[in-house]
Amino acid sequence: IKSSAASDVYKRQFLFLGGFLLQGFYEELVFRGFFMISIIRKNTIFVAVMVNSILFGLTHGFNNGFQVLALLNLILFGIFESIYLLKTGNIWGISAIHSMWNFIQGNIYGFNVSGMAQSQSIFIFKISNCEIFSGGTFGLEGSLLTTIVLLSAINMVILYNTALQLQ
């Protein structure tokens, strides 16, 4: 691990954070706030969650290093975000999660985010050649580790809300 701790890096990170906050909010507004809610009006919640999550995954299909595991993980991320929105009714929460997911991967740890390299990060990691764990050129979103994290997150958001309802 190398630290690129020059003060200009931190200034740029602050600007990137603003960009990622806008990007995350925009994607959540479009996919969950518009597509999913529009689909729910004429279909089941299950259909709405799956359709908007698959569309979300497919929009990243032309990104560098895109592969089947990346598509699966992006769909799982869409499912997590959809359930979170349905359980909480809070688009700000899912926007913040989405934005920070991208920002931390790319601008803090230096991983590619959905196949896009970041110009600078606070830390620089040497990625292993084992693409199943590193996600290869797509980044961590194409990793089996991310699949495990997302499946756990989906279960937690379902169980957490259920636990609140039981109280």
State what each model feature region is:
Residues 20, 44-61, 74-75:
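Small-polar-interrupted transmembrane alpha-helices in polytopic inner-membrane proteins
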Residues 1-6, 10:
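Single conserved hydrophobic/aromatic residue that forms the stacking wall/gate
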Residues 13-18, 26, 30, 71-76, ...:
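Membrane-embedded alpha-helical segments of multi-pass membrane proteins
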